Regions:
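Conserved "HGTGT" condensation-loop signature of ketosynthase/thiolase-family condensing enzymes
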Residues: 1-182
Length: 182
């Protein structure tokens, strides 16, 4: 059962939470982060490395914090798993890395562009930001195919899980949902 959702869309510069009727408008991910960290209305996450992260990591971090915020005082990182699923979340980063590699070669290319090309990095960084104390998994599948099976399997095989958060990244947006056992 989906308990709550959150989305961030860079094209419309809005963030939505299922528990709030009005979207949050922002001009940049840095501004959205500032709005969230300066308000006690949001779950506070560890965003110490936010400025150094690629946009796909920033999107995952902020969306999971927004999703957790939907739960208010009921949010807890204990017994929470996080699953990252396909979208096209790393495609832009893959292209940036490849173009830099082709232009500058192995010795002069920017190695820092490599890390965000790994599809598990955004979801792992989101888990760190929320201090999630459960498993983190990346599944390369369409959101409508193996995801529900993976969620059911995780709940069935791990009795300590209370909830599973899913993060689906696209180049300029992210969808996050929190699934509960019942």
């Amino acid at each position: 059962m989906i308990a709550c959702t959150a989305t961030i869309d860079l094209d419309s510069s809005t963030a939505t939470l299922s528990s709030r009727p009005q979207p949050i408008a922002f001009e940049s991910l840095q501004q959205l982060k500032q709005l969230m960290t300066e308000s006690s209305d949001f779950v506070q996450g560890d965003l110490a490395d936010f400025r150094r992260a690629a946009d796909n990591v920033r999107l995952a971090q902020l969306a999971t914090i927004l999703c957790a915020t939907n739960l208010g005082d009921k949010w807890s990182p204990e017994g929470t798993a996080l699953i990252g699923i396909n979208g096209d979340g790393c495609a832009l980063n893959n292209r940036l890395f490849w173009d830099d590699f082709i232009s500058h070669g192995h010795d002069n290319g920017r190695a820092s562009l490599f890390v965000p090309t790994l599809p598990s990095i955004p979801v792992c960084e989101a888990a760190i930001a929320l201090h999630i104390q459960g498993p983190v998994r990346y599944i390369a599948t369409e959101s409508a195919t193996l995801l529900e099976e993976a969620i059911s399997d995780m709940f069935a095989t791990d009795s300590t899980l209370r909830q599973i958060m899913t993060v689906e990244l696209f180049n300029r947006s992210v969808r996050c949902a929190l699934h509960t056992k019942n």
